[in-house]
């Protein structure tokens, strides 16, 4: 089953975050994303022609995030939006983060 076919499940905490090796294995499924140096977050910078296009993309990401009840951090500027995803409750990465990344990718930039 592909990540886009899955649904984020609520994380109640008490679950260990993925280690670097697990995260790198999951990253293969969302190859445009990068792992931060601590392996606690994935991120991707999307480029656009202008601010309006970037904002439109962020609004579409918001709809997906609300539907999945999993919310990324987003940096927005002229011609770009950077999406950063982690599971805050466990201060690291969970399968949910990669599911959301795949669904953001499916929006097309």
Curated annotation (Swiss-Prot):
Query: Hey, which family's this protein in?
Result: Belongs to the pterin-4-alpha-carbinolamine dehydratase family.
Q: Establish whether keyword Lyase is in the entry.
A: yes
Q: What is its EC number?
A: 4.2.1.96
Q: Which CDD domains match?
A: PCD_DCoH_subfamily_a
Lineage of the species this protein comes from? Bacteria, Pseudomonadati, Pseudomonadota, Gammaproteobacteria, Chromatiales
Which of UniProt's keywords are assigned here? Lyase
Provide a Gene Ontology MF annotation, just one.
Answer: 4-alpha-hydroxytetrahydrobiopterin dehydratase activity
Q: What is this protein called?
A: Putative pterin-4-alpha-carbinolamine dehydratase
Pfam families, per this entry? Pterin_4a
UniProt GO BP: tetrahydrobiopterin biosynthetic process
rRNA processing found in the keyword field: no
Give me the reactions it catalyses: (4aS,6R)-4a-hydroxy-L-erythro-5,6,7,8-tetrahydrobiopterin = (6R)-L-erythro-6,7-dihydrobiopterin + H2O
| InterPro entries reported in the protein's UniProt record | PCD_sf, Pterin_deHydtase
